[in-house]
């Protein structure tokens, strides 16, 4: 698995936020955000800045349980934002989060939603990096700007998604969805500029590995497009073949953590 350093993540939280701000410079902040129905561009930026402040509080206070996320989800009042106010606020939140992470160090313990007890805050450094990356893509699309992403970041973001796809919430039976696991169910993801991964759904729980194998379904394209495809964002470079229904089901189940309003 690709693992970038804690320091790199702390840097990227700030630099990705700066790039996001550049995408929206001069843009209409009331423009709708396609990937986040009901939000406009200003609300998207409020969400990202709220995410950063939420994570900063968790890290700074070494929270041992969930922290209220009103700044992340309560966006109804932010329908007509002023970029001159919003962009500096967004930058400030990213810098505060990065500083809190550095002050804590990667091994300090705090709550996170993926663990049943306080865990190293390195989780938050990585998670907020890719939270910012994906919403930067949303902002670029809404503003008519070009989105690109460093290959190392894209690979790690893909593997973060694959990691989440092995959590129980991503495969345990649900009455409202078909079963995910079963005989012959393997997926192949071919990043034409980075590498390949196989997801095996034939056992008692999903597993993934790097490499190539015969599969029931394949998604192929540049690694950034595969990342956007996973997140159900427009990904014109991603092509799929085989059991598309299985791919769609896997994406829906693997993205269980996106079902909450904050993502």
Segments predicted by a language model, with ranges:
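Short, contiguous alpha-helical
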Residues: 28-69, 115-172, 226
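Short, helix-capping/interhelical loops that line the mouth of catalytic, cofactor-
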Residues: 1-7, 51-110, 146-158, 162-169
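A glycine-rich beta-turn/hairpin centered on an aromatic-Pro dipeptide
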Residues: 161-198
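An N-terminal domain-cap segment
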Residues: 1-46, 55-57, 78
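C-terminal interaction segments
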Residues: 212-263
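Acidic/histidine-rich alpha-helical segments that form the ligand environment
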Residues: 78-109, 121-131, 138, 180-188, ...
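Acidic/His-leaning functional-site neighborhoods
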Residues: 189-223
């Amino acid at each position: 698995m690709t693992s970038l350093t804690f320091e790199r993540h702390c840097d990227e939280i700030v630099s990705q936020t700066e790039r996001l701000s550049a995408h929206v410079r001069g843009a209409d902040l009331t423009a709708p955000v396609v990937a986040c129905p009901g939000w406009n561009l200003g609300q998207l930026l409020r969400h990202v800045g709220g995410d950063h402040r939420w994570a900063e509080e968790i890290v700074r206070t070494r929270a041992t349980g969930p922290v209220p996320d009103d700044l992340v989800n309560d966006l109804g009042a932010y329908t007509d934002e002023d970029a001159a106010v919003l962009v500096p606020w967004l930058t400030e939140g990213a810098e505060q989060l990065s500083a809190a992470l550095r002050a804590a160090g990667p091994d300090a313990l705090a709550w996170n939603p993926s663990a049943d007890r306080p865990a190293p805050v390195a989780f938050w450094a990585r998670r907020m990096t890719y939270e910012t990356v994906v919403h930067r893509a949303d902002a670029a699309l809404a503003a008519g700007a070009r989105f690109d992403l460093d290959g190392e970041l894209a690979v790690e973001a893909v593997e973060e998604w694959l990691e989440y796809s092995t959590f129980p919430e991503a495969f345990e039976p649900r009455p409202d969805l078909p079963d995910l696991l079963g005989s012959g169910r393997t997926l192949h993801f071919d990043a034409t500029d980075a590498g390949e991964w196989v997801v095996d759904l034939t056992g008692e729980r999903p597993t993934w590995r790097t490499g190539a194998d015969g599969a029931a379904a394949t998604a192929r394209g540049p690694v950034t497009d595969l990342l956007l495809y996973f997140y159900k964002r427009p990904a014109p470079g991603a092509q799929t073949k085989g059991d598309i229904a299985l791919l769609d089901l896997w994406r829906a189940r693997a993205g269980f953590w996106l079902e909450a309003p904050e993502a």
